[in-house]
Amino acid sequence: MALRLAEQGYRVRIFERYPRPGGLARVLEVGGEPLEAFYHHLFTSDRAAVALAEELGVGDLLEWLPSKMGIWTEGRLWDFGTPVSLLRFRPLNPVDKLRFVLATLRLQYTGRYQQFENVSAVEWIRRTQGERVWRTVWGPLFHQKFADRAEQVAMVWLWGKLRLRGRSRSESGMGERLGYMRGSFARLITALESRITAAGGQLVLSEPVRRIERTEGRFQVVTRSGAHPADQVVVAAPVPDHIEIAGHLLDPQELRRLQDLHATAAICTVLELNRSLTPFYWLNIADPEMPFGGLIEHTNYIPRDRYDGRHILYISNYLFPDHPLYRATKEEVLGSYLPALQRVNPSFDRSWILASHHFHADYAQPVVTLGYREQIPEMRTSVPGLYLCCMAQIFPEDRGMNYAIVYGDRAARLVLDDLRRNGSGDPAPEPS
């Protein structure tokens, strides 16, 4: 978004909360190699991300590699995600498997998502796939991700996820190829930052916005370093942050609609191990007794020699901010995870852990409820010159890096259209 505005000659200043740019794609270092704090990959259908990488001269760094999916259920690991693995998946009987496959294919090949907007995901799955499939596969995953809001989730959300994943499968359906950038997606972010600054834009790191004020038709973006004037402001932040810094400017009805939106938070623990935990890249945990929802073993997808031989394991856990584990220390969280990791691999021992890292995201997954389209906040707010570009607007697709780019471009076009329509000669939009 900032790049598109700067390319048109507008003065752009970005206020970034974190010491490094990238948001959920920010990085740490493991074995001297950058690594995302939260696991990231691309699907083959993520055309916007691929196009941006090509535009910025880093497209040759993208690698498309096979990945392997598994599931933990009924106390053991199962290969899961290919026709052969499904045939061998004993927790479901042949009729269950057939219903599961037919329903999944319907979602992957149906383009008309509108039919799922006002349908409960829980009810649809139970009706089309049966109670055993719900209880064995989907139920634990939904409840781990959405807790007591699982019953509120619309089927269109699952349609978006399965349709996206289906497009990354080989024609035979025997595997999924995912995209990763050699040197991490920090290479894409660094290239984007360089292009923005070359176009005259400015990026200010570790400078969270505290408040946005508006006086006599101009904005003041207030940070710890002072008040910064702007003619237009784009808030590229989660809905709660938008409410906190700009809610007092909004129309009361618009503010109430924003307050009615909900999202789960997430904690992501990254372990550097001296050996592999499982044979899978992506392991869904379909067990309500387990304290996390997914194990993503990055080095079962990307060669571990890039990380000085270390095995990298992400432990994914979606929860709401009032969950006790969300405010727990890194050691407390890890302590609660260790017995579960030993269940997954009985040989696992704490001595396998060479280092650990712990990250929070207050706003990680919007809760897409029935009729969500009517709840989506507009990019143009009720305040002229104030815009919102956020995860909650991504629909019907699920959130991800590709759609952050798509919606950022969309917001930039909207701002540019308004500037041209209003005849502004030299505005200074300041995304934050």
Regions found by a protein language model. Give the residues of each.
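Glycine-rich FAD pyrophosphate-binding loop
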Residues: A6-V30
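Mid-domain catalytic core of redox enzymes
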Residues: Q8, E207-L313, N317-R327, E331, ...
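Dinucleotide-binding Rossmann-like beta1-alpha1 core, especially the glycine-rich loop
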Residues: G31-Q114
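Active-site/ligand-binding neighborhood in enzyme catalytic cores
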Residues: L92, V101-I212, A230
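A short, Lys/Arg-enriched amphipathic alpha-helix followed by its capping loop at the start of a domain
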Residues: M1-Y10, A199
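Feature captures the FAD/FMN-dependent oxidoreductase FAD-binding
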Residues: A48-W64, K68-F80, T128-W134, I196-L205, ...
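A conserved FAD-binding loop/helix module that cradles the flavin
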Residues: A392-V415
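FAD-binding beta-loop-beta segment adjacent to the flavin cofactor pocket
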Residues: I302-D308, A361-L388, A392-F395
